[in-house]
Amino acid sequence: MRSGPALALVVLLQACANTGPGPLPQGMAAERDLRGAFRAALCAPDRLAGDACARVLRSYDGEVAAPRPPAASPAKHRLVFVPGFLAACFRGIHSFEDVVVKAREAGFAADVLGVGGRNDLATNVKLIAEQIERLTAGDPRRLILVGHSKGANELLAMLIARPDIALRVDALLAVAGALNGSPLADDLYGLYGMTVALMPFDGCDRGAGDPVAELKPAVREAWWGTHGSALKTPVYALVALPDWSRLSPSLVGFYARLSYYTADNDSMLRVQDQVVPSSRLLGVVNANHLSVAIPHPGLLYLLVWSPVPFPRPEVYMAAIDVIAAQSR
């Protein structure tokens, strides 16, 4: 473990780092590098031009310029979103809300599925499959699934458990996906069991199973070893890595804890937790683990949420364009 002064130095260095060209952080090797296509889609003048895009999308060595992909077609694809761990539990938290509004304005059928905020994978997989069957009955459009944090893992597990649904899916977009788990699941497992696991929440019950245990890196490694070869759906990774100014106050302690391992973290996951070798890397965005998927929830969270806006609708729709182009 690092001493207090050493940890403070790490935090200070991170505040000044990760803003310009340099090598990709360790552990981010992917099957396909689509950073150039994603930049072309996001940084277009009609979406997020110039300095605004540079503040949101990080640059690293090895990115190859690519033409802007054509806009995705609402006639071909339907969008399905799954929130992350605990998101359903807190009043005023609405994952993907602004993204869904934007997608529907563009003509897409887009839905956020209801899952238990403290459920294990198996329980939420069943809920996800039931909702997809109900919402898409009779709809011939292909599905693009979008999962935040643990929601990405639940979608992965659903694709394995329900190959009939997987046949209708063109892609899974993992947004700050906990694909490889997180060291925090090991470090804070006991604390979770004595606190958050027992607390009453308006939006969720105590849930089923042991969701934090399923986020331990060793458990995720075992999952990939068992199921990775059976997964045929392409997984696209959108990685979150915030500047110090974009950390939510409520996440600073978690960021500091993860900094014992690496400063390249979004306050809940290291960057290498968000990518697997078989995934397709879209890019690294300057956002913390919450802001990358959840709009600012208002005055109730004023003192615990980052005030720096993040253009989720533009980022997600650019990602959908790239994914749709790859699916043609």
Located regions from the model:
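Flexible, membrane-associating and regulatory peripheral segments of lipid-active enzymes
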Residues: C16-R91, E97, V101, E105-A106, ...
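Short aromatic-enriched loop/helix-cap "lid" or pocket-rim segments at secondary-structure transitions
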Residues: I93, P183-L188, R246-L251
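Active-site catalytic motif of lipid deacylating hydrolases and related acyltransferases
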Residues: P70-L143, A197
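C-terminal catalytic-base region of ester-bond hydrolases, centering on the histidine
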Residues: A230-R328
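Serine-dependent carboxylesterase/thioesterase catalytic core
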Residues: K126-G225
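Glycine-rich His-Gly loop
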Residues: V82-F85, S149, G177, A240
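Bacterial N-terminal signal peptides that target proteins for export
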Residues: M1-P5
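Bacterial N-terminal signal peptides
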Residues: A6-Q14
